[in-house]
């Protein structure tokens, strides 16, 4: 048996495996892809953290709080032992004139295929992380990912050079004009795509208030179904909870709309393992602080009753 959250996710995985289009991609890994799909999660029925594999709430929450703070440097994430953005910063470093270690060209694929190289890669990555944590000037130069999510959410710059805080503005709009159809935040800034380590995959979200409940719809242009989407579901569910609390509302639905929803070819066996599992009851979320959303810390968040099957490892496509 599956709970409603795991069931919706499993159905999408099964559909992509059954009818997905086989396509090449930027990473040259290969994918099975479906264009256009929507999932709906009733947040009043629990917190949608998948249970058919263990998903780290800490990684999800600290990344979201990093976005909310407007931060774009992995130093904050590494302080919480959050490594999900490391590869993109590391890639910039090993391509620079300041790097004098072993050749790290195409490190993502080589680490998977060559055990000896993988040990070198892990050693160089470990050194890089310590430099980021302990040397602020190094972190400023090589830990920053460019104008990624947090920058666009909190400090969008228009062509005249004016700065605009989208997240703060949308919260004020929800409070003062709840029926507005303009409760929108966009991370997709076409003029700054080239200055981002990775163009935003989850590109735009909109809020909707009805009967004292706040719902959120995300449009995700590119969705790594196995590794990314379980994080994205929980991240935007958490964002909905935080903004609902900020605006004295209850939570409604999280609606997840996909553009290119894909399973990488080297994730298929991992997906099949997950699909063979039954689920547990979903956990619940408790926010143990009345602080502003902009001052919330990870320690203020409590996930209650999360039981899951073991995690399933799979390579990330860089």
Swiss-Prot record:
**Bridged cysteine pairs (disulfide):** none
The entry's dUMP-binding residues are: 26, 181-182, 221-224, 232, 262-264
What this protein catalyses is: dUMP + (6R)-5,10-methylene-5,6,7,8-tetrahydrofolate = 7,8-dihydrofolate + dTMP
An example Gene Ontology biological process: methylation
Gene Ontology molecular-function annotations:
thymidylate synthase activity
Chief location: cytoplasm
| GO CC, alphabetical | cytosol
Q: What class of enzyme is it?
A: transferase
Mention any Pfam family matching this sequence. Answer: Thymidylat_synt
Q: Write down the InterPro entries for this protein, in alphabetical order.
A: Thymidate_synth/dCMP_Mease, Thymidate_synth/dCMP_Mease_dom, Thymidate_synth/dCMP_Mease_sf, Thymidylate_synthase, Thymidylate_synthase_AS
| Signal peptide start-end | none
Alphabetized, the UniProt keywords read: Cytoplasm, Methyltransferase, Nucleotide biosynthesis, Transferase
Its UniProt pathway annotation is:
Pyrimidine metabolism; dTTP biosynthesis
Specify which residues bind (6R)-5,10-methylene-5,6,7,8-tetrahydrofolate according to the UniProt entry for this protein.
Answer: 224, 317
PROSITE patterns to which the protein is assigned, alphabetical: THYMIDYLATE_SYNTHASE
Q: Where is the active site?
A: 201
Q: Where in the cell is it found?
A: Cytoplasm
Q: What is its EC number?
A: 2.1.1.45
| Residues forming coiled coils | none
Q: Quick check: keyword Nucleotide-binding in the entry?
A: no
HAMAP family given in the database record: Thymidy_synth_bact
Q: How does it assemble?
A: Homodimer.
Record family assignment: Belongs to the thymidylate synthase family. Bacterial-type ThyA subfamily.
Role:
Catalyzes the reductive methylation of 2'-deoxyuridine-5'-monophosphate (dUMP) to 2'-deoxythymidine-5'-monophosphate (dTMP) while utilizing 5,10-methylenetetrahydrofolate (mTHF) as the methyl donor and reductant in the reaction, yielding dihydrofolate (DHF) as a by-product. This enzymatic reaction provides an intracellular de novo source of dTMP, an essential precursor for DNA biosynthesis.
What name does this protein carry? Answer: Thymidylate synthase
Source organism (scientific name): Staphylococcus haemolyticus (strain JCSC1435)
Q: What is the lineage of its organism?
A: Bacteria, Bacillati, Bacillota, Bacilli, Bacillales
């Amino acid at each position: 048996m599956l709970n409603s959250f795991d069931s919706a996710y499993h159905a999408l995985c099964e559909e992509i495996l059954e009818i997905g289009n086989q396509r090449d991609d930027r990473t040259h890994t290969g994918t099975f892809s479906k264009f256009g799909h929507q999932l709906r999660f009733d947040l009043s029925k629990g917190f949608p953290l998948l249970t058919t594999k263990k998903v780290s709430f800490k990684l999800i929450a600290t990344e979201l709080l990093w976005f909310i703070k407007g931060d774009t440097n992995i130093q904050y994430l590494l302080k919480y032992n959050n490594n999900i953005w490391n590869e993109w910063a590391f890639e910039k470093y090993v391509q620079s004139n300041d790097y004098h270690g072993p050749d790290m060209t195409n490190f993502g694929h080589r680490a998977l295929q060559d055990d000896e190289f993988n040990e070198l890669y892990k050693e160089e990555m470990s050194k890089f992380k310590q430099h980021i944590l302990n040397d602020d000037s190094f972190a400023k130069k090589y830990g920053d990912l460019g104008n990624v999510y947090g920058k666009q959410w909190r400090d969008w710059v228009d062509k005249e050079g004016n700065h605009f805080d989208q997240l703060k503005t949308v919260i004020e709009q929800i409070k003062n004009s709840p029926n507005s159809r303009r409760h929108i935040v966009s991370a997709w800034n076409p003029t700054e795509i080239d200055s981002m380590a990775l163009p935003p995959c989850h590109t735009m979200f909109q809020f909707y208030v009805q009967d004292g409940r706040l719902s959120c719809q995300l449009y995700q242009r590119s969705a790594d179904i196995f590794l990314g989407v379980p994080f994205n579901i929980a991240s935007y569910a958490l964002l909905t909870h935080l903004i609902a609390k900020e605006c004295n509302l209850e939570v409604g639905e999280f609606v997840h709309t996909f553009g290119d929803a894909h399973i990488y070819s080297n994730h298929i066996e991992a997906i099949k393992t997950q699909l063979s599992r039954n689920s547990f009851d979903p956990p619940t979320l408790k926010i143990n602080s009345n602080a502003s959303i902009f001052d919330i810390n990870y320690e203020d968040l409590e996930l209650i009753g999360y039981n899951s099957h073991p995690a399933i490892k799979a390579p990330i496509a860089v």
